[in-house]
Amino acid sequence: MREPDFLNHFLKKGYFKKHAKAVLALSGGLDSMFLFKVLSTYQKELEIELILAHVNHKQRIESDWEEKELRKLAAEAELPIYISNFSGEFSEARARNFRYDFFQEVMKKTGATALVTAHHADDQVETIFMRLIRGTRLRYLSGIKEKQVVGEIEIIRPFLHFQKKDFPSIFHFEDTSNQENHYFRNRIRNSYLPELEKENPRFRDAILGIGNEILDYDLAIAELSNNINVEDLQQLFSYSESTQRVLLQTYLNRFPDLNLTKAQFAEVQQILKSKSQYRHPIKNGYELIKEYQQFQICKISPQADEEEDELVLHYQNQVAYQGYLFSFGLPLEGESIQQIPVSRETSIHIRHRKTGDVLIQNGHRKKLRRLFIDLKIPMEKRNSALIIEQFGEIVSILGIATNNLSKKTKNDIMNTVLYIEKIDR
């Protein structure tokens, strides 16, 4: 194939339509060097500013010489290049994580929004086959994605539809360690696939076909389940066990960096079925929150170091506190103003719940803990609920319940009103 053929493919796919700056992960191998040649030649046509990034893994004698040559190449092309050296105990996983962390740093520094890698169809076959041998979940057998949004960046793999044999032989560095079978991927490439191709010469095409078919099913299920609120457990549990599992897996696709194992997935299923309330970290900075018939998975948000102190409000005063405006005896106007009868004889205390808190209702004392359970108040709402206290007794739990003391206060000569308005925090 000729270079213009690759350009036409890139333009047809619109890989760089949304991007002004792109970082190319440049290893020095044939695939990344040819991608460099295409992108640097057609920067104007693709309307991108190209930035190069290279990781020297320090695993071969030639590594430092290759780094120098790449610096020369960047200088000749008048392109910026960023280089980082891997250190520590080497493994495929550590090296991969190091590379992507470094690439993200470069993107943040340069304002680039696209990371371009030279993965091709042969890499795709190896990846799918590796995952199959490892016993990964079905959805991961769709392989590497052509385009993948991770946070605020997009990873683009424009060579994924091409095989390595489609690339012309140009100047590049040959990694001799690729011929050794020390690493799993090398054994796949050098031994397993060639043997299986003796049985089926089109084995690579078959693997790619399976990956594409799984991707089709995955996308179809996502589209068909678009109107199903999986986080509503009543809705989720109305389906068969098999459908529940598929819907839950589709829901988990929203969190590409979560990657639950089969055992962890089964544990999440069990929690959703058995626990009424649950909040706990699960993996990779995510937590599972369940509150009766609702659940969600979200990033763990940082907690404040210290709780806010109790607030004291005096008669004829106003104060904004935790998203509300409290006005003691001074009327507020509006349709959504809450009014609680109180006494003007003493100040009002506004706080969060404490151990042993009691509310009087219909002449009976009820512990807040029991009240919250009876009313099925979610744990998060229990912890954030504002309690209004006067004369050492709870007058109201804002938006949840009111003490019968307020009825007595209505007819008291010293009565007044606490006005409450929801405001932006």
Curated annotation (Swiss-Prot):
What is the E.C. number? 6.3.4.19
**Which InterPro entries does the protein's record reference?**
Lysidine-tRNA-synth_C, Rossmann-like_a/b/a_fold, TilS/TtcA_N, tRNA_Ile_lys_synt, tRNA_Ile_lys_synt_N
**Which SUPFAM superfamilies does the record associate with it?**
Adenine nucleotide alpha hydrolases-like (SSF52402), PheT/TilS domain (SSF56037)
| Chain positions recorded as ATP binding sites | S27, G28, G29, L30, D31, S32
The answer to whether keyword Lipoprotein applies is no
Major subcellular site: cytoplasm
* Gene3D superfamilies noted in UniProt: HUPs
Return one Gene Ontology term, BP aspect.
tRNA modification
* Top-level division of the source organism's lineage: Bacteria
Q: Which GO terms describe its cellular component?
A: cytoplasm
UniProt function note? Ligates lysine onto the cytidine present at position 34 of the AUA codon-specific tRNA(Ile) that contains the anticodon CAU, in an ATP-dependent manner. Cytidine is converted to lysidine, thus changing the amino acid specificity of the tRNA from methionine to isoleucine.
Assigned protein family:
Belongs to the tRNA(Ile)-lysidine synthase family.
Q: What is known of its domains?
A: The N-terminal region contains the highly conserved SGGXDS motif, predicted to be a P-loop motif involved in ATP binding.
Q: What is this protein called?
A: tRNA(Ile)-lysidine synthase
Where does this protein come from, organism-wise? Streptococcus pneumoniae (strain 70585)
The gene designation is tilS
